[in-house]
Amino acid sequence: MNVTLLIPARYGSSRFPGKPLAPINGKPMIQHVYERASLAKGLTNIYVATDDERIKSAVEGFGGKVVMTSPDAASGTDRINDAINQLGLKDDDLVINLQGDQPLIDPTSIEQVISLFERHPGEFEMATLGYEIVNKAELDDPMHVKMVFDNDYYALYFSRARIPFGRDTKDYPVYKHLGVYAYTRRFVQAFAALPLGRLEDLEKLEQLRALEYGHKIKVAISAFDSIEVDTPEDIRKCEQRLAVD
């Protein structure tokens, strides 16, 4: 099975302009993401998907591969779809979408989503990762997306709110979503063609579009957390983690 990992990277960000090139211990963040991903077993190729020449130059500077996408991409999925069309991937090729703000992603987490497709061929169209929240401050933080899933580990919903809500207790596990997706090229193209979902638009979470249109999302629970860099303050958290990693 051919497995291509794509890292979408956008220079513009309302909260943190130039985020992919922000230095973390002397390296741009996108380099940390790329190098972490390259340690995962089972990958055929890794590319950064971007529309920015500064990001392209930085990636090529450390020996990485880049696919240039349209600056008019309306969403991360549109950028991924543009990239896979340029790369000429086959319908059944597996695509891993690793968000470019995950400089501490554990390579085994990437291997987990690949393994789901290997062990359950044809049972679902999309897979992703969850992690049980241990930092209580994340429970009610809308920047940390929460998720619920059924007994067979199929996603039921994703929300910026705390879900599920315990009416009579606060002592129960809550899982957050980690920014890794896996799907076939065929599904990416079908997904990108779907109209914006009502819930997707409300929560600003693209994965809800898949659920709204009846597609299954298989979930693997990671043993490792991954810090998402949303603000300059998150850079310091990453550097502290890397100091003991």
Swiss-Prot record:
GO terms for molecular function: 3-deoxy-manno-octulosonate cytidylyltransferase activity. It catalyses: 8-amino-3,8-dideoxy-alpha-D-manno-octulosonate + CTP = CMP-8-amino-3,8-dideoxy-alpha-D-manno-oct-2-ulosonate + diphosphate. Its main location: cytoplasm. GO terms for cellular component: cytosol. Its EC number is 2.7.7.90. Pathway: Bacterial outer membrane biogenesis; lipopolysaccharide biosynthesis. Keywords: Cytoplasm, Lipopolysaccharide biosynthesis, Nucleotidyltransferase, Transferase. It is an enzyme of class 2 (transferase). It is found in: Cytoplasm. One of its GO terms (biological process) is lipopolysaccharide biosynthetic process. Belongs to the KdsB family. Activates KDO8N (a required 8-carbon sugar) for incorporation into bacterial lipopolysaccharide in the Shewanella genus. This is 8-amino-3,8-dideoxy-manno-octulosonate cytidylyltransferase. It comes from Shewanella oneidensis (strain ATCC 700550 / JCM 31522 / CIP 106686 / LMG 19005 / NCIMB 14063 / MR-1). The gene is kdsB.
